[in-house]
Amino acid sequence: MKAKIHPKYHQAKARCACGNEFEVGSTSENIRVEICSKCHPFYTGAKGRLVDTTGRVDRFKKKYGLS
C-alpha cells in the first residue's frame, strides 16, 4: 500500500433529524442523516406514519390520483 494517500479514519458522530446521535466509523467527522433506526417505520413498527417533510408522497398521490 502507498503511504499518505488514504484519508484519515475517525469515530464520527452521526446526528439524525429526529435528534438521535450515534457513533460510526467514517472519513468525515460529523454526519447528518434524515432518518435512523429510532425513527424509521420499519424499526419502530409504525406502518404508514413516515414523516414526509418535503411533501413528495402527497405530490405523488395527487399526480396519480391515489389520495
From Swiss-Prot:
Alphabetical GO CC annotations of the entry are: ribonucleoprotein complex; ribosome
| Binding site residues for Zn(2+) | C16, C18, C36, C39
Q: What's the short name of a Pfam family annotated to this entry?
A: Ribosomal_L31
Q: Which cofactor does it need?
A: Zn(2+)
**A Gene Ontology BP annotation from the UniProt entry:** translation
Asked whether the UniProt record includes Zinc among its keywords, one would answer: yes
Among the GO molecular function terms of this UniProt record, one is:
rRNA binding
Entry note: cofactor: Binds 1 zinc ion per subunit.
The protein's UniProt keywords, in alphabetical order, are: Metal-binding, Ribonucleoprotein, Ribosomal protein, RNA-binding, rRNA-binding, Zinc
- What is annotated about its quaternary structure and interactions? Part of the 50S ribosomal subunit.
Record's family?
Belongs to the bacterial ribosomal protein bL31 family. Type A subfamily.
The record's function comment reads: Binds the 23S rRNA.
PANTHER family from the UniProt entry: 50S RIBOSOMAL PROTEIN L31, CHLOROPLASTIC, LARGE RIBOSOMAL SUBUNIT PROTEIN BL31C
List, alphabetically, the HAMAP family matched.
Answer: Ribosomal_bL31_1 (MF_00501)
What's the name of the protein?
Answer: Large ribosomal subunit protein bL31
Q: Which organism is it from?
A: Syntrophomonas wolfei subsp. wolfei (strain DSM 2245B / Goettingen)
